[in-house]
């Protein structure tokens, strides 16, 4: 606040919201795991915010680093459909993972996506991975491929 007061022109007596926004950084770092959580919970707003953040930082978040995490999440979701008991503990024991992982990602994913949709999502992730490596895609940038994939997953 002291720095804002010092930077304030002599003719002004009040600090405005625009001056505060201009003097601080309003960006937030996101992780691939937050992105995975947003997709599993089908949180369209958060998934799109994170996707735009990744698109604006392609060197720090290349598509080839994002896709394996998303693939693993949806592959685990597909496997969970075959668990003999569809409870939190039943799925956790059957898959050999912690129950908090089931509670955080698997159960919301099972509520939001059918088994057929998950198979289609896995296919779309594999297709996006191939396209990011130049197969059937000579020039589409990674950010555009990610946008297409996220739209397919969420809609």
Regions found by a protein language model. Name each.
Residues 69, 120, 124-127, 149-152:
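Charged, amphipathic alpha-helical oligomerization/scaffolding segments
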Residues 85-90, 137-144:
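Long amphipathic alpha-helical segments
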Residues 5, 32, 74-81, 129-133, ...:
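A structural signal for well-ordered alpha-helices, especially hydrophobic packing surfaces
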Residues 107-139:
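C-terminal capping/gating helix-and-loop segments adjacent to ligand/active sites or protein-protein/ligand interfaces
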């Amino acid at each position: 606040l002291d720095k804002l007061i010092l930077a304030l022109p002599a003719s002004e007596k009040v600090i405005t919201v625009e001056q505060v926004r201009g003097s601080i950084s309003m960006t937030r770092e996101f992780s691939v795991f937050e992105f995975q959580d947003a997709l599993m919970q089908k949180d369209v707003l958060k998934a799109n915010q994170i996707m735009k953040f990744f698109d604006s930082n392609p060197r720090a978040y290349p598509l080839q680093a994002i896709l394996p995490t998303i693939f693993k999440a949806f592959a685990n979701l597909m496997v969970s459909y075959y668990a003999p008991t569809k409870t939190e503990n039943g799925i956790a024991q059957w898959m050999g993972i912690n129950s908090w992982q089931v509670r955080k990602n698997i159960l919301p994913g099972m509520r939001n996506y059918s088994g057929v949709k998950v198979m289609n999502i896995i296919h779309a992730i594999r297709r996006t991975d191939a396209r990011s490596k130049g197969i059937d895609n000579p020039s589409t940038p990674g950010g555009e491929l990610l946008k297409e994939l996220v739209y397919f997953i969420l809609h």
